[in-house]
UniProtKB/Swiss-Prot annotation:
CDD domains xref list: LipB (cd16444)
Gene Ontology MF terms in the entry: lipoyl(octanoyl) transferase activity
Gene name linked to the record: lipB
Name used for this protein in its record: Octanoyltransferase
Task performed by this protein: Catalyzes the transfer of endogenously produced octanoic acid from octanoyl-acyl-carrier-protein onto the lipoyl domains of lipoate-dependent enzymes. Lipoyl-ACP can also act as a substrate although octanoyl-ACP is likely to be the physiological substrate.
GO annotation terms (biological process): protein modification process
Domain named BPL/LPL catalytic: residues: 49-231
UniProt-annotated location(s): Cytoplasm
Gene Ontology CC terms: cytoplasm
Length: 231
């Protein structure tokens, strides 16, 4: 896994000439089953060259999703609906105040390398956080974006963004969830992403003392996306 900005060649994921990426934004929380259905249909259309690549910005109502590596034991308390999903990763929470970015890109046009694609998603979020004065970091052994929390003790880090993707015919779907101002107590019902080490928790921009609107996040995401993915 690429673990530093210096070793990540962003040019690798610039698309070959074609239609620009379509940006979609949903203003109301989207039920999870409907979102998955929409992603799968769009990914199939992209793979068949019938639709442009797309980034979909949305929120979900409170729920849990369990990826292909998930364990039932990591659901401590079933307070909200649980959905099994084909994305990579383990169990996580989605809810209001969290910016979900579902990323449907044709990696054949870019670079058919899953590990580097995930590293580019991390870089995208790191650059977005930097726009708000937050230093996000990637870790080789823990997918996602992390924030050092020395105020909580030596070696303590909190995850601020989770990543889980699936590919079909080299078109990605699912994507990234960035904690802006969700109810962090809802993460107590699970072992987030299977990480049980007490040094590693969950945070949000609000938890870090920043009051940021989702519209501001969306603008930063769109700007930094072009820096990383080239369109």
């Amino acid at each position: 896994m690429i673990n530093s900005r210096q070793t990540l060649d962003l040019k690798l994921f610039a698309a070959s000439p074609g239609e620009p990426v379509d940006w979609r934004r949903s203003d109301q929380p989207v039920p999870y089953p409907g979102a998955v259905d929409a992603m799968e249909r769009r990914a199939a259309a992209i793979a068949s060259s019938e639709a442009a690549e797309q980034v979909w910005l949305l929120e979900h109502p409170p729920l849990y999703t369990c990826g292909t590596s998930g364990r039932e034991a990591d659901l401590v308390k079933a307070r909200f609906p649980l959905f099994s999903t084909g994305r990579g990763g383990q169990i996580t929470y989605h809810g209001p105040g969290q910016r979900i970015a579902y990323v449907m890109l044709d990696l054949k046009r870019r670079r058919p390398d899953v590990r580097e694609f995930i590293a580019c998603l991390e870089e995208w979020i790191i650059r977005t956080l930097d726009a708000f004065g937050v230093k996000g970091e990637r870790r080789e052994d823990r997918v996602g974006v992390w924030v050092a929390r020395p105020d909580k003790g030596p070696g303590h880090e909190d995850k601020i963004a989770a990543i889980g993707v699936r590919l079909r015919r080299w078109v990605s779907f699912h994507g990234v969830s960035l904690n802006v101002d969700p109810d962090l107590s809802h993460f107590a019902d699970i072992v987030p992403c299977g990480v049980s080490d007490p040094r590693y928790g969950v945070t949000s921009l609000a938890d870090l003392g920043l009051r940021v609107r989702l519209t501001d996040i969306d603008q930063a995401l769109k700007r930094t996306f072009s820096e990383v993915f080239g369109s």
